[in-house]
Protein backbone atom coordinates (compact mmCIF):
# COMPACT_ATOMS: atom_id res chain seq x y z
CA UNK A 1 0.00 0.00 0.00
CA UNK A 2 2.77 2.27 0.90
CA UNK A 3 4.54 1.34 -2.27
CA UNK A 4 1.48 2.03 -4.32
CA UNK A 5 1.11 5.40 -2.72
CA UNK A 6 4.77 6.20 -3.25
CA UNK A 7 4.63 5.23 -6.91
CA UNK A 8 1.51 7.30 -7.35
CA UNK A 9 3.24 10.28 -5.74
CA UNK A 10 6.20 9.83 -8.01
CA UNK A 11 3.96 9.73 -11.05
CA UNK A 12 2.14 12.81 -9.85
CA UNK A 13 5.50 14.59 -9.42
CA UNK A 14 7.05 13.59 -12.78
CA UNK A 15 3.92 14.14 -14.88
CA UNK A 16 3.89 17.97 -14.56
CA UNK A 17 7.65 18.07 -14.79
CA UNK A 18 7.62 16.19 -18.10
CA UNK A 19 4.86 18.39 -19.42
CA UNK A 20 6.89 21.45 -18.44
CA UNK A 21 9.94 20.04 -20.18
CA UNK A 22 7.93 19.41 -23.34
CA UNK A 23 6.60 22.96 -23.31
CA UNK A 24 10.10 24.36 -22.89
CA UNK A 25 11.31 22.22 -25.79
CA UNK A 26 8.48 23.48 -28.00
CA UNK A 27 9.26 27.08 -27.07
CA UNK A 28 12.92 26.58 -27.92
CA UNK A 29 12.01 24.98 -31.25
CA UNK A 30 9.77 27.91 -32.17
CA UNK A 31 12.51 30.39 -31.26
CA UNK A 32 14.98 28.50 -33.47
CA UNK A 33 12.57 28.59 -36.40
CA UNK A 34 12.09 32.33 -35.96
CA UNK A 35 15.84 32.93 -35.87
CA UNK A 36 16.43 30.91 -39.00
CA UNK A 37 13.66 32.78 -40.80
CA UNK A 38 15.08 36.16 -39.78
CA UNK A 39 18.55 35.12 -40.95
CA UNK A 40 17.16 34.12 -44.35
CA UNK A 41 15.42 37.48 -44.67
CA UNK A 42 18.58 39.37 -43.77
CA UNK A 43 20.64 37.47 -46.37
CA UNK A 44 18.05 38.27 -49.04
CA UNK A 45 18.13 41.96 -48.15
CA UNK A 46 21.98 42.00 -48.32
CA UNK A 47 21.96 40.47 -51.79
CA UNK A 48 19.44 43.05 -52.94
CA UNK A 49 21.56 45.87 -51.52
CA UNK A 50 24.73 44.60 -53.25
CA UNK A 51 22.91 44.28 -56.56
CA UNK A 52 21.62 47.81 -56.14
CA UNK A 53 25.10 49.15 -55.36
CA UNK A 54 26.57 47.43 -58.43
CA UNK A 55 23.85 48.90 -60.58
CA UNK A 56 24.50 52.38 -59.15
CA UNK A 57 28.24 52.09 -59.88
CA UNK A 58 27.54 51.04 -63.46
CA UNK A 59 25.21 53.99 -63.87
CA UNK A 60 27.89 56.37 -62.54
CA UNK A 61 30.53 55.04 -65.00
CA UNK A 62 28.11 55.36 -67.89
CA UNK A 63 27.40 58.95 -66.87
CA UNK A 64 31.16 59.76 -66.66
CA UNK A 65 31.83 58.35 -70.13
CA UNK A 66 28.88 60.28 -71.42
CA UNK A 67 30.19 63.51 -69.88
CA UNK A 68 33.66 62.91 -71.37
CA UNK A 69 32.18 62.31 -74.81
CA UNK A 70 30.10 65.41 -74.35
CA UNK A 71 33.15 67.53 -73.44
CA UNK A 72 35.12 66.14 -76.42
CA UNK A 73 32.21 66.90 -78.71
CA UNK A 74 32.07 70.40 -77.25
CA UNK A 75 35.79 70.90 -77.99
CA UNK A 76 35.35 69.69 -81.56
CA UNK A 77 32.33 71.88 -82.04
CA UNK A 78 34.26 74.84 -80.59
CA UNK A 79 37.20 74.26 -82.99
CA UNK A 80 34.88 73.93 -85.96
CA UNK A 81 33.02 77.02 -84.82
CA UNK A 82 36.30 78.97 -84.59
CA UNK A 83 37.27 77.86 -88.07
CA UNK A 84 33.82 78.82 -89.33
CA UNK A 85 34.13 82.20 -87.60
CA UNK A 86 37.49 82.80 -89.27
CA UNK A 87 36.07 81.88 -92.65
CA UNK A 88 33.05 84.09 -92.00
CA UNK A 89 35.35 86.99 -91.09
CA UNK A 90 37.38 86.39 -94.24
CA UNK A 91 34.29 86.20 -96.44
CA UNK A 92 32.69 89.12 -94.64
CA UNK A 93 35.78 91.24 -95.29
CA UNK A 94 35.74 90.22 -98.93
CA UNK A 95 32.02 90.92 -99.16
CA UNK A 96 32.50 94.30 -97.46
CA UNK A 97 35.02 95.19 -100.14
CA UNK A 98 32.54 94.01 -102.76
CA UNK A 99 29.85 96.03 -101.03
CA UNK A 100 31.95 99.20 -101.12
CA UNK A 101 32.65 98.71 -104.79
CA UNK A 102 29.03 97.84 -105.41
CA UNK A 103 27.81 101.03 -103.76
CA UNK A 104 29.93 102.98 -106.17
CA UNK A 105 28.58 100.98 -109.13
CA UNK A 106 24.91 100.13 -108.51
CA UNK A 107 22.41 99.70 -105.65
CA UNK A 108 21.51 96.17 -106.71
CA UNK A 109 25.05 94.92 -106.23
CA UNK A 110 25.10 96.62 -102.83
CA UNK A 111 21.96 94.80 -101.79
CA UNK A 112 23.40 91.50 -103.02
CA UNK A 113 26.55 92.03 -100.93
CA UNK A 114 24.50 92.74 -97.83
CA UNK A 115 22.50 89.55 -98.37
CA UNK A 116 25.68 87.54 -98.75
CA UNK A 117 27.12 89.05 -95.55
CA UNK A 118 23.94 88.28 -93.62
CA UNK A 119 23.93 84.75 -94.99
CA UNK A 120 27.53 84.23 -93.91
CA UNK A 121 26.85 85.64 -90.46
CA UNK A 122 24.24 82.94 -89.85
CA UNK A 123 26.73 80.09 -90.39
CA UNK A 124 27.98 79.87 -86.81
CA UNK A 125 24.42 79.42 -85.51
CA UNK A 126 23.82 76.63 -87.96
CA UNK A 127 27.04 75.03 -87.01
CA UNK A 128 26.20 75.30 -83.33
CA UNK A 129 22.75 73.78 -83.92
CA UNK A 130 24.22 70.95 -85.91
CA UNK A 131 26.86 70.32 -83.26
CA UNK A 132 24.18 69.63 -80.64
CA UNK A 133 23.52 66.21 -82.19
CA UNK A 134 26.80 64.60 -81.03
CA UNK A 135 25.76 65.35 -77.45
CA UNK A 136 23.08 62.68 -77.80
CA UNK A 137 24.65 60.39 -80.37
CA UNK A 138 27.73 58.29 -79.67
CA UNK A 139 31.04 59.13 -81.33
CA UNK A 140 32.25 57.27 -84.41
CA UNK A 141 35.68 55.57 -84.29
CA UNK A 142 36.53 56.55 -87.87
CA UNK A 143 35.95 60.24 -87.09
CA UNK A 144 38.18 60.01 -84.01
CA UNK A 145 40.93 58.37 -86.08
CA UNK A 146 40.58 61.09 -88.73
CA UNK A 147 40.82 63.86 -86.12
CA UNK A 148 43.90 62.27 -84.52
CA UNK A 149 45.49 62.04 -87.96
CA UNK A 150 44.83 65.74 -88.55
CA UNK A 151 46.36 66.66 -85.20
CA UNK A 152 49.50 64.63 -85.89
CA UNK A 153 49.76 66.25 -89.33
CA UNK A 154 49.51 69.72 -87.80
CA UNK A 155 52.19 68.89 -85.20
CA UNK A 156 54.48 67.47 -87.92
CA UNK A 157 53.95 70.62 -89.96
CA UNK A 158 54.96 72.80 -87.02
CA UNK A 159 58.13 70.78 -86.43
CA UNK A 160 59.17 70.72 -90.08
CA UNK A 161 58.86 74.43 -90.74
CA UNK A 162 62.04 76.53 -91.13
CA UNK A 163 62.65 79.89 -89.38
CA UNK A 164 60.96 82.85 -90.96
CA UNK A 165 58.97 80.81 -93.54
CA UNK A 166 55.27 80.46 -94.31
CA UNK A 167 53.65 77.08 -94.92
CA UNK A 168 50.07 76.02 -95.63
CA UNK A 169 48.61 73.33 -93.36
CA UNK A 170 45.04 72.21 -94.10
CA UNK A 171 44.44 75.34 -96.13
CA UNK A 172 45.69 77.76 -93.41
CA UNK A 173 49.02 79.61 -93.32
CA UNK A 174 51.30 78.97 -90.37
CA UNK A 175 54.02 81.48 -89.47
CA UNK A 176 57.19 80.58 -87.54
CA UNK A 177 59.15 83.50 -86.16
CA UNK A 178 62.21 83.63 -83.97
CA UNK A 179 63.38 86.28 -81.56
CA UNK A 180 66.84 87.36 -80.54
CA UNK A 181 69.63 85.00 -79.63
CA UNK A 182 68.65 85.29 -75.97
CA UNK A 183 65.23 83.80 -76.72
CA UNK A 184 66.75 80.76 -78.38
CA UNK A 185 68.31 79.49 -75.15
CA UNK A 186 66.22 77.37 -72.85
CA UNK A 187 66.12 77.35 -69.07
CA UNK A 188 67.95 74.02 -68.71
CA UNK A 189 71.74 74.25 -68.90
CA UNK A 190 72.35 70.76 -70.26
CA UNK A 191 75.63 69.73 -71.84
CA UNK A 192 74.06 69.17 -75.24
CA UNK A 193 72.70 72.72 -75.42
CA UNK A 194 76.04 74.17 -74.31
CA UNK A 195 77.84 72.16 -76.99
CA UNK A 196 75.35 73.30 -79.62
CA UNK A 197 75.80 76.95 -78.64
CA UNK A 198 79.59 76.51 -78.75
CA UNK A 199 79.42 74.95 -82.22
CA UNK A 200 77.23 77.81 -83.43
CA UNK A 201 79.65 80.45 -82.09
CA UNK A 202 82.62 78.59 -83.60
CA UNK A 203 80.93 78.29 -86.99
CA UNK A 204 80.12 82.02 -86.95
CA UNK A 205 83.64 83.07 -86.02
CA UNK A 206 85.06 80.72 -88.67
CA UNK A 207 82.69 82.08 -91.29
CA UNK A 208 83.82 85.63 -90.41
CA UNK A 209 87.46 84.58 -90.86
CA UNK A 210 86.73 82.88 -94.17
CA UNK A 211 85.01 86.03 -95.50
CA UNK A 212 87.95 88.13 -94.36
CA UNK A 213 90.44 85.81 -96.03
CA UNK A 214 88.44 85.92 -99.28
CA UNK A 215 88.46 89.72 -99.18
CA UNK A 216 92.21 89.65 -98.60
CA UNK A 217 92.68 87.42 -101.64
CA UNK A 218 90.75 89.84 -103.85
CA UNK A 219 93.20 92.68 -103.24
CA UNK A 220 95.55 91.27 -105.88
CA UNK A 221 98.59 91.10 -103.61
CA UNK A 222 100.27 87.72 -103.67
CA UNK A 223 102.22 88.17 -100.48
CA UNK A 224 101.66 85.19 -98.17
CA UNK A 225 101.05 85.35 -94.41
CA UNK A 226 104.04 85.33 -92.12
CA UNK A 227 104.56 83.86 -88.73
CA UNK A 228 104.67 86.75 -86.30
CA UNK A 229 104.12 85.04 -83.00
CA UNK A 230 106.50 86.04 -80.23
CA UNK A 231 106.63 85.48 -76.55
CA UNK A 232 107.91 88.94 -75.65
CA UNK A 233 108.68 92.04 -77.74
CA UNK A 234 111.95 93.96 -77.86
CA UNK A 235 110.60 96.48 -75.30
CA UNK A 236 111.20 96.31 -71.60
CA UNK A 237 107.59 95.65 -70.60
CA UNK A 238 107.61 91.88 -70.03
CA UNK A 239 109.62 90.13 -67.37
CA UNK A 240 108.40 86.53 -67.43
CA UNK A 241 109.69 83.87 -69.79
CA UNK A 242 107.15 81.36 -71.06
CA UNK A 243 107.23 78.66 -73.69
CA UNK A 244 105.01 79.01 -76.70
CA UNK A 245 102.37 76.41 -77.19
CA UNK A 246 102.74 74.06 -80.14
CA UNK A 247 100.73 74.88 -83.18
CA UNK A 248 98.15 72.27 -83.99
CA UNK A 249 98.01 71.11 -87.59
CA UNK A 250 94.36 70.21 -87.28
CA UNK A 251 93.49 73.74 -86.17
CA UNK A 252 95.42 75.16 -89.11
CA UNK A 253 93.53 72.98 -91.55
CA UNK A 254 90.30 73.96 -89.88
CA UNK A 255 90.70 77.56 -91.03
CA UNK A 256 90.62 76.45 -94.66
CA UNK A 257 87.48 74.34 -94.14
CA UNK A 258 85.28 77.08 -92.73
CA UNK A 259 81.57 77.40 -93.21
CA UNK A 260 80.30 80.14 -95.45
CA UNK A 261 78.59 83.15 -93.94
CA UNK A 262 75.28 82.26 -95.54
CA UNK A 263 75.00 79.02 -93.61
CA UNK A 264 74.52 80.90 -90.34
CA UNK A 265 70.96 81.70 -91.40
CA UNK A 266 70.03 77.99 -91.27
CA UNK A 267 71.26 77.25 -87.77
CA UNK A 268 68.66 75.10 -85.98
CA UNK A 269 67.06 76.75 -82.96
CA UNK A 270 66.06 75.12 -79.72
CA UNK A 271 62.55 76.57 -79.62
CA UNK A 272 60.09 78.09 -82.03
CA UNK A 273 56.75 79.84 -81.50
CA UNK A 274 54.08 79.50 -84.23
CA UNK A 275 51.80 82.50 -84.56
CA UNK A 276 48.06 82.25 -84.02
CA UNK A 277 46.01 81.56 -87.08
CA UNK A 278 43.95 84.40 -88.52
CA UNK A 279 45.73 87.16 -86.54
CA UNK A 280 47.03 89.55 -89.18
CA UNK A 281 48.47 92.02 -86.67
CA UNK A 282 50.59 89.38 -85.01
CA UNK A 283 51.85 88.32 -88.41
CA UNK A 284 52.99 91.83 -89.20
CA UNK A 285 54.68 92.19 -85.82
CA UNK A 286 56.54 88.91 -86.23
CA UNK A 287 57.80 89.96 -89.66
CA UNK A 288 58.99 93.29 -88.25
CA UNK A 289 60.76 91.59 -85.34
CA UNK A 290 62.47 89.09 -87.63
CA UNK A 291 63.61 91.87 -89.96
CA UNK A 292 64.96 93.90 -87.03
CA UNK A 293 66.83 90.86 -85.67
CA UNK A 294 68.30 90.10 -89.09
CA UNK A 295 69.42 93.71 -89.50
CA UNK A 296 71.04 93.72 -86.06
CA UNK A 297 72.85 90.47 -86.81
CA UNK A 298 73.98 91.84 -90.17
CA UNK A 299 75.31 95.02 -88.52
CA UNK A 300 77.20 93.06 -85.87
CA UNK A 301 78.62 90.76 -88.56
CA UNK A 302 79.75 93.68 -90.70
CA UNK A 303 81.32 95.35 -87.68
CA UNK A 304 83.31 92.26 -86.77
CA UNK A 305 84.38 91.82 -90.39
CA UNK A 306 85.55 95.42 -90.52
CA UNK A 307 87.54 94.93 -87.32
CA UNK A 308 89.23 91.78 -88.64
CA UNK A 309 89.91 93.44 -92.00
CA UNK A 310 91.50 96.36 -90.22
CA UNK A 311 93.60 93.96 -88.15
CA UNK A 312 94.73 92.12 -91.27
CA UNK A 313 95.61 95.35 -93.04
CA UNK A 314 97.57 96.50 -90.02
CA UNK A 315 99.45 93.20 -90.01
CA UNK A 316 100.19 93.68 -93.71
CA UNK A 317 101.62 97.12 -93.05
CA UNK A 318 103.82 95.72 -90.30
CA UNK A 319 104.93 92.81 -92.46
CA UNK A 320 107.78 94.79 -93.97
CA UNK A 321 109.75 94.14 -90.81
CA UNK A 322 109.93 90.44 -91.67
CA UNK A 323 111.05 88.50 -94.70
CA UNK A 324 109.00 85.77 -96.33
CA UNK A 325 110.83 85.35 -99.60
CA UNK A 326 111.98 81.91 -98.53
CA UNK A 327 108.33 80.87 -98.46
CA UNK A 328 107.67 81.94 -102.06
CA UNK A 329 108.27 79.98 -105.21
CA UNK A 330 110.51 81.46 -107.96
CA UNK A 331 107.49 82.06 -110.22
CA UNK A 332 105.73 84.03 -107.49
CA UNK A 333 108.80 86.12 -106.90
CA UNK A 334 109.08 86.90 -110.60
CA UNK A 335 105.45 88.05 -110.69
CA UNK A 336 105.45 89.91 -107.39
CA UNK A 337 106.86 93.42 -107.42
CA UNK A 338 105.90 95.07 -104.15
CA UNK A 339 107.33 98.52 -103.52
CA UNK A 340 108.59 99.06 -99.99
CA UNK A 341 107.51 102.53 -98.83
CA UNK A 342 110.15 105.05 -98.01
CA UNK A 343 110.95 105.48 -94.35
CA UNK A 344 110.51 101.77 -93.56
CA UNK A 345 113.76 100.02 -92.65
CA UNK A 346 114.95 97.09 -94.73
CA UNK A 347 114.11 93.62 -93.40
CA UNK A 348 116.92 91.97 -91.52
CA UNK A 349 116.99 88.83 -93.66
CA UNK A 350 116.67 90.57 -97.04
CA UNK A 351 119.52 89.60 -99.40
CA UNK A 352 118.92 92.11 -102.16
CA UNK A 353 118.72 91.98 -105.97
CA UNK A 354 121.22 90.86 -108.57
CA UNK A 355 121.30 92.34 -112.10
CA UNK A 356 122.39 89.80 -114.71
CA UNK A 357 122.64 89.76 -118.53
CA UNK A 358 122.28 86.47 -120.45
CA UNK A 359 123.45 85.96 -124.03
CA UNK A 360 123.34 82.63 -125.84
CA UNK A 361 124.75 81.99 -129.33
CA UNK A 362 123.65 78.74 -130.92
CA UNK A 363 126.35 78.84 -133.59
CA UNK A 364 129.17 78.78 -131.07
CA UNK A 365 127.17 76.90 -128.41
CA UNK A 366 128.24 79.39 -125.76
CA UNK A 367 126.31 80.99 -122.95
CA UNK A 368 127.70 84.25 -121.60
CA UNK A 369 126.49 85.43 -118.21
CA UNK A 370 127.36 88.97 -117.15
CA UNK A 371 127.01 89.80 -113.45
CA UNK A 372 126.43 93.54 -113.45
CA UNK A 373 125.79 94.58 -109.85
CA UNK A 374 123.99 93.77 -106.61
CA UNK A 375 121.60 96.14 -104.87
CA UNK A 376 119.79 96.31 -101.57
CA UNK A 377 122.27 94.17 -99.65
CA UNK A 378 122.27 94.27 -95.84
CA UNK A 379 124.62 96.88 -94.43
CA UNK A 380 127.55 96.07 -92.21
CA UNK A 381 125.64 96.76 -89.01
CA UNK A 382 123.18 94.01 -89.89
CA UNK A 383 125.25 91.48 -91.79
CA UNK A 384 128.62 92.04 -90.13
CA UNK A 385 130.47 92.13 -93.47
CA UNK A 386 131.09 94.63 -96.26
CA UNK A 387 132.74 92.41 -98.90
CA UNK A 388 130.78 90.37 -101.44
CA UNK A 389 131.39 87.72 -104.07
CA UNK A 390 129.09 85.92 -106.55
CA UNK A 391 129.48 82.24 -107.46
CA UNK A 392 127.90 80.87 -110.64
CA UNK A 393 127.38 77.21 -111.57
CA UNK A 394 125.60 75.50 -114.47
CA UNK A 395 123.15 72.80 -113.40
CA UNK A 396 122.60 69.90 -113.44
CA UNK A 397 126.13 68.84 -114.30
CA UNK A 398 127.97 71.35 -112.03
CA UNK A 399 131.00 70.95 -114.27
CA UNK A 400 131.01 74.57 -115.39
CA UNK A 401 131.64 77.04 -112.60
CA UNK A 402 132.68 80.63 -112.20
CA UNK A 403 133.02 83.40 -109.64
CA UNK A 404 133.51 87.12 -109.52
CA UNK A 405 136.12 89.14 -107.73
CA UNK A 406 135.43 90.45 -104.23
CA UNK A 407 133.73 93.84 -104.22
CA UNK A 408 132.98 96.08 -101.24
CA UNK A 409 130.08 98.27 -100.27
CA UNK A 410 126.33 97.86 -99.82
CA UNK A 411 125.80 98.06 -103.63
CA UNK A 412 128.81 96.32 -105.19
CA UNK A 413 129.39 96.63 -108.95
CA UNK A 414 130.98 93.57 -110.56
CA UNK A 415 130.59 93.82 -114.37
CA UNK A 416 132.23 90.46 -114.88
CA UNK A 417 131.44 87.76 -117.43
CA UNK A 418 131.27 84.00 -117.00
CA UNK A 419 131.17 81.85 -120.16
CA UNK A 420 129.78 78.32 -120.40
CA UNK A 421 130.95 76.49 -123.54
CA UNK A 422 129.73 73.38 -125.34
CA UNK A 423 126.09 73.97 -124.51
CA UNK A 424 124.02 72.52 -127.33
CA UNK A 425 120.68 74.18 -128.22
CA UNK A 426 118.66 71.04 -127.45
CA UNK A 427 120.12 70.95 -123.92
CA UNK A 428 119.51 74.59 -123.05
CA UNK A 429 115.91 74.12 -121.89
CA UNK A 430 116.97 71.36 -119.47
CA UNK A 431 119.64 73.47 -117.74
CA UNK A 432 119.64 76.15 -115.09
CA UNK A 433 122.15 78.65 -113.71
CA UNK A 434 122.51 79.03 -109.95
CA UNK A 435 123.72 82.30 -108.46
CA UNK A 436 124.95 82.50 -104.89
CA UNK A 437 126.05 85.57 -103.00
CA UNK A 438 128.80 85.03 -100.44
CA UNK A 439 130.08 87.29 -97.68
CA UNK A 440 133.87 87.33 -97.84
CA UNK A 441 135.87 87.61 -94.61
CA UNK A 442 139.54 87.69 -93.93
CA UNK A 443 141.12 84.62 -92.35
CA UNK A 444 137.74 82.87 -92.30
CA UNK A 445 135.69 80.85 -94.72
CA UNK A 446 133.04 82.39 -96.94
CA UNK A 447 129.46 82.69 -95.74
CA UNK A 448 126.61 82.20 -98.20
CA UNK A 449 123.98 84.92 -97.78
CA UNK A 450 121.52 84.25 -100.61
CA UNK A 451 120.89 82.36 -103.81
CA UNK A 452 118.68 82.27 -106.88
CA UNK A 453 118.05 79.72 -109.63
CA UNK A 454 117.38 80.86 -113.21
CA UNK A 455 115.98 78.28 -115.63
CA UNK A 456 117.31 78.58 -119.17
CA UNK A 457 113.95 77.55 -120.59
CA UNK A 458 113.00 81.22 -120.12
CA UNK A 459 116.02 82.37 -122.09
CA UNK A 460 115.63 84.19 -125.40
CA UNK A 461 117.00 82.16 -128.32
CA UNK A 462 119.05 85.01 -129.77
CA UNK A 463 120.30 88.30 -128.37
CA UNK A 464 120.80 89.64 -124.88
CA UNK A 465 118.36 89.28 -122.03
CA UNK A 466 118.54 91.49 -118.93
CA UNK A 467 117.14 89.97 -115.74
CA UNK A 468 116.92 91.20 -112.15
CA UNK A 469 117.05 88.25 -109.77
CA UNK A 470 115.69 88.46 -106.22
CA UNK A 471 118.17 86.64 -104.01
CA UNK A 472 116.52 84.27 -101.56
CA UNK A 473 118.14 83.84 -98.14
CA UNK A 474 119.25 80.21 -98.22
CA UNK A 475 116.06 79.02 -99.93
CA UNK A 476 115.45 75.50 -101.08
CA UNK A 477 115.91 75.55 -104.86
CA UNK A 478 114.00 72.31 -105.37
CA UNK A 479 110.75 73.59 -103.75
CA UNK A 480 109.79 76.19 -106.32
CA UNK A 481 107.78 74.05 -108.70
CA UNK A 482 110.48 74.08 -111.36
CA UNK A 483 110.32 72.12 -114.61
CA UNK A 484 113.56 70.44 -113.58
CA UNK A 485 113.23 67.56 -111.19
CA UNK A 486 115.11 67.81 -107.89
CA UNK A 487 117.27 64.86 -108.84
CA UNK A 488 118.15 66.44 -112.19
CA UNK A 489 119.10 69.78 -110.65
CA UNK A 490 120.91 68.74 -107.48
CA UNK A 491 120.25 65.64 -105.45
CA UNK A 492 122.38 66.92 -102.61
CA UNK A 493 120.40 70.16 -102.36
CA UNK A 494 117.06 68.38 -101.92
CA UNK A 495 117.68 65.34 -99.75
CA UNK A 496 120.83 65.72 -97.68
CA UNK A 497 121.91 68.17 -95.02
CA UNK A 498 125.37 66.70 -94.49
CA UNK A 499 127.01 67.86 -97.71
CA UNK A 500 129.98 70.19 -97.84
CA UNK A 501 129.59 73.91 -97.25
CA UNK A 502 130.46 74.69 -100.84
CA UNK A 503 127.07 73.29 -101.82
CA UNK A 504 125.29 75.20 -99.04
CA UNK A 505 123.67 72.08 -97.59
CA UNK A 506 124.38 72.74 -93.90
CA UNK A 507 121.42 73.92 -91.80
CA UNK A 508 121.75 77.47 -90.53
CA UNK A 509 119.92 79.66 -88.05
CA UNK A 510 119.49 83.44 -87.97
CA UNK A 511 119.69 84.71 -84.38
CA UNK A 512 119.35 88.23 -82.99
CA UNK A 513 120.99 89.21 -79.66
CA UNK A 514 120.66 92.33 -77.54
CA UNK A 515 121.51 93.13 -73.91
CA UNK A 516 120.37 96.03 -71.76
CA UNK A 517 122.86 96.63 -68.95
CA UNK A 518 120.45 98.91 -67.07
CA UNK A 519 117.68 96.35 -66.69
CA UNK A 520 119.88 93.25 -67.00
CA UNK A 521 117.72 91.71 -69.71
CA UNK A 522 119.21 89.47 -72.38
CA UNK A 523 116.88 89.34 -75.40
CA UNK A 524 117.33 86.44 -77.81
CA UNK A 525 115.31 86.41 -81.03
CA UNK A 526 115.12 83.22 -83.04
CA UNK A 527 114.35 84.73 -86.42
CA UNK A 528 114.47 82.00 -89.06
CA UNK A 529 116.19 78.85 -90.22
CA UNK A 530 117.57 77.62 -93.51
CA UNK A 531 118.02 74.20 -95.10
CA UNK A 532 116.22 72.26 -92.38
CA UNK A 533 115.75 68.81 -93.84
CA UNK A 534 114.22 65.53 -92.77
CA UNK A 535 116.68 62.69 -93.23
CA UNK A 536 114.05 59.98 -92.76
CA UNK A 537 111.60 60.93 -95.53
CA UNK A 538 111.77 63.20 -98.54
CA UNK A 539 109.59 65.95 -97.10
CA UNK A 540 110.05 69.17 -95.18
CA UNK A 541 110.37 68.63 -91.42
CA UNK A 542 108.27 69.93 -88.54
CA UNK A 543 110.80 71.92 -86.51
CA UNK A 544 110.97 73.87 -83.27
CA UNK A 545 113.76 75.43 -81.23
CA UNK A 546 114.84 75.11 -77.61
CA UNK A 547 116.90 77.69 -75.73
CA UNK A 548 118.91 76.95 -72.57
CA UNK A 549 120.77 79.44 -70.39
CA UNK A 550 123.63 77.78 -68.46
CA UNK A 551 125.79 79.18 -65.69
CA UNK A 552 129.58 78.99 -65.45
CA UNK A 553 129.55 75.37 -64.22
CA UNK A 554 127.05 74.17 -66.85
CA UNK A 555 123.95 74.12 -64.68
CA UNK A 556 120.67 75.09 -66.30
CA UNK A 557 119.34 78.49 -65.20
CA UNK A 558 116.36 78.84 -67.56
CA UNK A 559 114.82 77.18 -70.59
CA UNK A 560 112.13 77.91 -73.19
CA UNK A 561 111.08 76.76 -76.64
CA UNK A 562 109.39 78.04 -79.77
CA UNK A 563 106.21 76.84 -81.40
CA UNK A 564 106.29 74.23 -84.13
CA UNK A 565 106.68 75.20 -87.77
CA UNK A 566 105.18 72.42 -89.85
CA UNK A 567 106.46 71.34 -93.25
CA UNK A 568 108.91 74.22 -93.82
CA UNK A 569 112.51 73.74 -94.95
CA UNK A 570 113.16 77.44 -94.23
CA UNK A 571 110.93 78.19 -91.24
CA UNK A 572 110.33 81.72 -89.98
CA UNK A 573 110.02 81.86 -86.19
CA UNK A 574 110.33 85.55 -85.22
CA UNK A 575 110.03 84.72 -81.52
CA UNK A 576 111.85 86.63 -78.78
CA UNK A 577 112.84 85.30 -75.37
CA UNK A 578 114.08 87.41 -72.45
CA UNK A 579 116.50 86.13 -69.80
CA UNK A 580 117.37 88.02 -66.63
CA UNK A 581 121.18 88.18 -66.42
CA UNK A 582 123.17 90.61 -64.30
CA UNK A 583 126.02 92.53 -65.91
CA UNK A 584 128.70 90.78 -63.86
CA UNK A 585 127.25 87.39 -64.90
CA UNK A 586 127.13 88.13 -68.63
CA UNK A 587 130.66 86.85 -69.26
CA UNK A 588 130.04 83.64 -67.28
CA UNK A 589 126.81 82.38 -68.88
CA UNK A 590 126.33 80.26 -71.99
CA UNK A 591 123.31 80.39 -74.32
CA UNK A 592 122.61 77.10 -76.08
CA UNK A 593 120.12 76.93 -78.96
CA UNK A 594 119.00 73.55 -80.34
CA UNK A 595 116.70 72.83 -83.30
CA UNK A 596 114.64 69.63 -83.28
CA UNK A 597 112.61 67.75 -85.85
CA UNK A 598 109.35 66.51 -84.41
CA UNK A 599 108.47 63.08 -85.80
CA UNK A 600 105.24 61.18 -85.39
CA UNK A 601 105.32 57.87 -83.50
CA UNK A 602 109.05 58.34 -82.92
CA UNK A 603 111.34 60.32 -80.70
CA UNK A 604 112.37 63.83 -81.62
CA UNK A 605 115.46 64.23 -83.77
CA UNK A 606 118.01 67.01 -83.29
CA UNK A 607 118.86 68.89 -86.48
CA UNK A 608 121.69 70.88 -84.93
CA UNK A 609 122.78 73.23 -82.15
CA UNK A 610 124.94 76.28 -81.40
CA UNK A 611 126.33 77.82 -78.22
CA UNK A 612 127.10 81.48 -77.53
CA UNK A 613 128.77 83.05 -74.52
CA UNK A 614 131.41 81.64 -72.22
CA UNK A 615 131.55 78.24 -73.94
CA UNK A 616 130.86 79.28 -77.53
CA UNK A 617 130.69 76.57 -80.18
CA UNK A 618 132.85 78.54 -82.64
CA UNK A 619 134.60 81.79 -83.46
CA UNK A 620 131.56 83.27 -85.20
CA UNK A 621 129.39 82.61 -82.18
CA UNK A 622 131.99 84.17 -79.88
CA UNK A 623 132.30 87.23 -82.14
CA UNK A 624 128.52 87.61 -82.16
CA UNK A 625 128.43 87.52 -78.35
CA UNK A 626 131.22 90.06 -77.96
CA UNK A 627 129.65 92.40 -80.51
CA UNK A 628 126.35 92.21 -78.63
CA UNK A 629 128.07 93.37 -75.43
CA UNK A 630 129.76 96.26 -77.23
CA UNK A 631 126.64 97.65 -78.91
CA UNK A 632 124.91 98.31 -75.54
CA UNK A 633 121.26 97.53 -76.27
CA UNK A 634 121.22 97.36 -80.07
CA UNK A 635 120.16 94.08 -81.63
CA UNK A 636 122.83 92.21 -83.60
CA UNK A 637 121.68 89.52 -86.05
CA UNK A 638 123.94 86.80 -87.46
CA UNK A 639 123.61 83.54 -89.38
CA UNK A 640 125.09 80.54 -87.56
CA UNK A 641 125.78 77.09 -88.96
CA UNK A 642 124.19 74.42 -86.78
CA UNK A 643 126.48 71.71 -85.47
CA UNK A 644 125.23 68.17 -85.79
CA UNK A 645 124.77 66.19 -82.61
Swiss-Prot record:
Biased composition range(s): Low complexity: 485-502
Keyword set includes Lyase: no
Composition bias type Polar residues, residue spans: 167-177, 287-303
Protein name per its UniProtKB record: Synaptotagmin-16
Similarity comment: family membership: Belongs to the synaptotagmin family.
Gene Ontology molecular function terms on file: identical protein binding; phospholipid binding
Domain C2 positions: 350-469, 505-640
Gene that this polypeptide is encoded by: SYT16
Purpose of the protein: May be involved in the trafficking and exocytosis of secretory vesicles in non-neuronal tissues. Is Ca(2+)-independent.
Organism per entry: Homo sapiens
